[in-house]
Regions:
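Catalytic core of pol beta-like nucleotidyltransferases
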Residues: 1-22, 30-36, 47-104
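Acidic Asp/Glu-based divalent-cation binding sites
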Residues: 39-41
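Short hydrophobic/aromatic beta-strand micro-patches
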Residues: 43-45
Length: 104
């Protein structure tokens, strides 16, 4: 199962309110193996992160009401660049199998 274009556009539209530089879709929706029980995994890359937990909560609030379950990670560009080379890190999985759905 893949993410519908209309839902992807709505996700991007809502998350633009937190000024992302890039948004990745990863996990089962990116690989085409999603089932009806799958959540939608997103990584939001943004320059200024005041509080990671607050940013993740804010992103989830923005996505509320779309009728899907979301798991949202937030990272700076520097964190993503550093950890995407680390074996076993979620950032490496994202760099290898994820899809960019928004970039400035």
């Amino acid at each position: 199962m893949r993410l519908h274009d209309e839902l992807t556009r709505e996700i991007v539209s809502r998350l633009q309110q937190i000024n992302p530089q890039k948004i990745f879709l990863f996990g089962s929706y990116a690989t085409g193996t999603a089932s009806t029980d799958s959540d939608i995994d997103l990584l939001v890359i943004k320059e200024a992160i005041s509080s990671r937990s607050k940013e993740m909560v804010e992103a989830r609030k923005l996505l509320k009401g779309l009728g899907e379950a979301f798991d949202v990670l937030v990272a700076t560009p520097e964190e993503y660049e550093f950890y995407r080379h680390e074996a076993g890190s979620v950032y490496r999985e994202i760099s290898e199998r994820g899809m960019v759905i928004y970039a400035t």
